[in-house]
Amino acid sequence: MYRINLTTFTLLLVLAVGSLMSESLHPSDGAINDLYEYLLQREYAAPVSYADHQIKRKAVRSPSLRLRFGRRSDPSVPLRPEEDELIDQKAIRAPQLRLRFGRNDPLWTSFNENALLEENFEKRAPSQRLRWGRSNLFGNLVNQFQQDDVMQQKTIRAPQLRLRFGRTDPSWAMYNEHQLTTGQQAQPANEASEKRAPTQRLRWGRSDPALAKDSSEDKALDVEESENTNADDK
């Protein structure tokens, strides 16, 4: 009797465990449908998290966004008249300063607006150029106030002492002008065709102005000596 009761209890236990295992392997259709509906809802705050992976569904996009095949709007939704008016009334933008790769400089947006105003300004006067194309600031101010006088009363400048590579020594400019005016006053009209006295040449064909005066004095002494000799011979 005891053996029969033990065998019956064992069979009942095996059947109970088998039924539980079969239910866990084959869930009901209701649980699957609930999970499917939960995943297909329109929006939710957090993604559905599982132990081995994650599933996240995006919210439904509005029809104004770009759809398939490059369409900007849903063909079933009509366009608003405000957008058409804005497209028709869109003005052509002014040309802007282009940077590399077609970018625009935001600092130069008002450049074209002021371009017409800058054209009305007077052009700058020609300035005295220094070495390497630099301009003399003092010369610019003088040209701005005396532009007409300089252009009308411009005369041929006197020969100046040239330095190396064609540069001019400004300290000799006034000296050469003074020498030129005094020489023109001292020379008589009949000696205009007389050749100048040979002077000692410096480097690059320059003449020493200090020796020019000495050569003229020597020539005058030679003339006086020749006259004295002619008088003695007579």
From Swiss-Prot:
Residues 181-190 have a biased composition (Polar residues). Belongs to the NPY family. It is found in: Secreted. The modification Tryptophan amide is found at W132, W204. GO terms for cellular component: extracellular region. Residues 1-22 form the signal peptide. One of its GO terms (molecular function) is neuropeptide hormone activity. It comes from Anopheles gambiae (African malaria mosquito). Residues 181-234 are annotated as: Disordered. The modification Phenylalanine amide is found at F69, F101, F165. Expressed in all body parts of larva, pupae and adults. Plays a role in controlling food intake and regulating body size. The gene is sNPF. This is Short neuropeptide F. Residues 23-56, 207-234 form a propeptide. Keywords: Amidation, Cleavage on pair of basic residues, Neuropeptide, Secreted, Signal. It comes from the Eukaryota. One of its GO terms (biological process) is regulation of response to food.
